[in-house]
């Protein structure tokens, strides 16, 4: 076996891609900070039970497991940073008011999520803890869209759903609640024949409402149809009102409502939003409310947030991250050394061409040169 081979769906990040990823990481983290988000850095490795407090069977299957040589306990390589940030908020910070946190780090998956997807993503995201009102969801949705616009993306489609609709329907019918997981699978897959079979012996109102969900998709006007076809329950009314406000706030993007798009239903407790762009089949960013996520750490707090994969974002982003630089000669010259140091202190990239390699400069566009004129080193256009 060749020693340079890597595992399937694992790849090195080469300079051009790494430069673009880092440019996007800095842009997004700076934008998060402008909203008041504080950065945290959870560890890549934790005890397995801490990592799997939420997310269900899917998260367990995606998590790499190994044995700690010090304690003998099972450890996990994180597959999602969100539960770790919830642990920090609930157990370490222990604040009473609103807390805004953000993060950026690697996550590992046992299996890729798509044919060409990597198993090592660079997850970046933001979370708000401590506010149950829709205002927090509106801020997170706006921040997610800001992040995508900062990456140069256009023609964004925002899909909206709400976990509260299905939860309210199941809560009013114990027989339906017993089939909750099967109903969730049928709705998520838009499997209408299976949905008809699962609801065949349910009450007429519950059956009609559940069977209506796969057909309640489209632009924001579909919410009016949903109000007409779904039971008048406080939870459903509130969910539809929330979706209407989220749709109204999303300026400059195409908004779609899909009341059966329940991916992550077991994890979320309220509004869910997913961003797509033309030409890319999979979601580029996901977010939503998950008020119960901190419960396993002894302190359930209202929470909402979003995340995305920086490597995928860099792949589709049109921004040009190739930096400009100043080309300087290599010489044992104190004045040259002082000039180079001063330029670097001022934030310039200065590349000193090693002897015999004056023209081998792939990663930077050297648009200026440092040259000696009348005994002084000055920068000139190339």
UniProtKB/Swiss-Prot annotation:
KW Transmembrane (keyword) present: no
Pfam families named in the record: tRNA-synt_His
Subunit structure: Heteromultimer composed of HisG and HisZ subunits.
Keyword annotations from UniProtKB, A to Z: Amino-acid biosynthesis, Cytoplasm, Histidine biosynthesis
Molecular function terms from GO: histidine-tRNA ligase activity
Pathway: Amino-acid biosynthesis; L-histidine biosynthesis; L-histidine from 5-phospho-alpha-D-ribose 1-diphosphate: step 1/9
Gene name, Swiss-Prot/TrEMBL: hisZ
Name of the protein in question: ATP phosphoribosyltransferase regulatory subunit
Family as reported in the entry's similarity comment: Belongs to the class-II aminoacyl-tRNA synthetase family. HisZ subfamily.
